[in-house]
Amino acid sequence: MTASASTRLIAALLATLLAAACSGDSPSARGATPSAGAVNRAAAHKIDDSAAGNVDLGSAKYHVNPSLGATGSVHGTIKLEAPSRADSNGSASRICGSKPAAAARDKAGALVWIVGLSSGKPLPIEKRAELSSEDCLVFPPVQAAVVGTTFNVFNDDKTLHKFVFTRAGTHDTLAVMPFFNAGQVVASERLAKSSGIVEIRCTRHPWTHGYIAVFDHPYFDVTDASGKFSIDSVPPGTYSVMVWQEGMDKPEPHRVQIAAGGSATLDLSGGAGR
């Protein structure tokens, strides 16, 4: 393990211990409402993420089936056009980089999940995830996790950030995280308490935003840089496989039949919200 990796791990562990020791959250760190100025700045950059409120991840009171038997899988490639995002401007570009929007588009991911499964394979044992700010961008810009996941949120920029995490649709504030220096980390168990889409914004850099999809079952994936996804250990049957990406008005359902020992394929391309 390198020195930088060790430092990052130690910081994450300290943040987790601090979060566990706190019975409440400081108003200066969490629970605050974004200022009117922050809302106006975001509106000026014309980021329309209202469609995220239309995404239903399908709570089904999932339970593990210890006698699952033979299963199948679904895989494929999703290459949908991501929307343009506003670039940074002025002095911010000297700190954040000159092309944050292009980087965000290149790394855009699509959510893929199966609906209608109330039982199946076990949930992930490891319920810890990382989120970071790099060049004033959220990485990964789209992430998926299960209910109960603890997030370690890092600031890798030498500039101030104030991340606001809200629930899509209701816009209820889940957490507010101010960052004052590079290397700072905050651990939070608030972001994945229940299923749904969580929106991420920075009040200081309105083009900085991302999404966390929180599921109460394990049958989901996020496409990688090449657009590929894979969901395994699926009980045999016919399912609706949902696909959603920023820019789509609502998730697209795709009917897929999965046989025991087989692998179904789902490939999509074209414009988002076709």
Residue ranges and their predicted role:
Residues 2-11:
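Bacterial N-terminal signal peptides that target proteins for export
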Residues 14-16:
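Hydrophobic alpha-helical targeting segments used for export or membrane insertion
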Residues 18-21:
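C-terminal motif of bacterial Sec signal peptides marking the signal peptidase cleavage site
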Residues 24-274:
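Extracytoplasmic copper-binding redox domains, predominantly the cupredoxin/blue-copper superfamily
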